[in-house]
């Protein structure tokens, strides 16, 4: 769920102290991402829930109506959009400092794009970078998300992301690299940097 929070820290603290919000919908993990750059509006942040299947995620939608949230919670936020996202490649829940890019990829190139993202992730890790690349397809995302994919480049810290980008821009890019293949198949729509954290775990 994408929201505009009056005070992102206060909002995060409030929902973190109320685990029943996540237990009631069957989340296995939950957290927040606060947008640091590329904001579309003040207080931009993303509240995420992880489920063990799309089935569980869809069932979770039926168990929570944002319009019926406690008054204190409602007063702390304005809801912008919500969606279900399906990961298209292996992705471990390990939030951190994240570059989030929404892209368009032609449907016939989807499998090749996911393979290129996997290749890029493997190449980056082989070069010593602590990075994970997630590719997500939206389900019921409205006009903002329809026809796009969300790509998340996840690293533990701003320093590690910055160092990785410094190294990247000072290196020659092979046309056979995973990055080059991804770029050739995608058209960027939006690009932000988010600071993410996990605030709930079912286990």
Question: Could you say what each language-model-derived stretch is?
Answer:
Residues 1-203:
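Short S/T/G/P-rich N-terminal loop/turn motif that feeds into the first structured element of a domain
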């Amino acid at each position: 769920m994408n929201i505009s929070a009056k005070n992102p820290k206060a909002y995060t603290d409030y929902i973190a102290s109320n685990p029943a919000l996540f237990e009631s919908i069957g989340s296995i993990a939950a957290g927040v991402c606060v947008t640091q750059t590329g904001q579309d509006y003040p207080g931009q942040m993303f509240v995420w829930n992880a489920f063990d299947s799309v089935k569980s995620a869809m069932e979770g939608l039926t168990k929570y109506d944002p319009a019926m949230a406690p008054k204190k919670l409602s007063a702390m936020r304005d809801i912008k959009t919500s969606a279900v996202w399906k990961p298209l490649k292996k992705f471990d829940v390990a939030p951190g400092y994240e570059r989030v890019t929404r892209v368009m990829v032609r449907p016939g190139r989807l499998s090749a794009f996911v393979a290129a993202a996997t290749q890029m992730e493997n190449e980056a890790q082989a070069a010593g970078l602590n990075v994970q690349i997630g590719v997500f397809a939206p389900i019921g995302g409205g006009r903002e998300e329809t026809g796009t994919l969300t790509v998340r480049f996840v690293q533990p810290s701003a320093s590690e992301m910055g160092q990785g980008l410094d190294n990247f821009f000072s290196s020659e890019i092979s046309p056979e690299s995973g990055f080059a293949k991804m770029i050739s198949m995608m058209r960027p729509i939006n690009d932000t940097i988010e600071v993410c954290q996990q605030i709930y775990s079912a286990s």
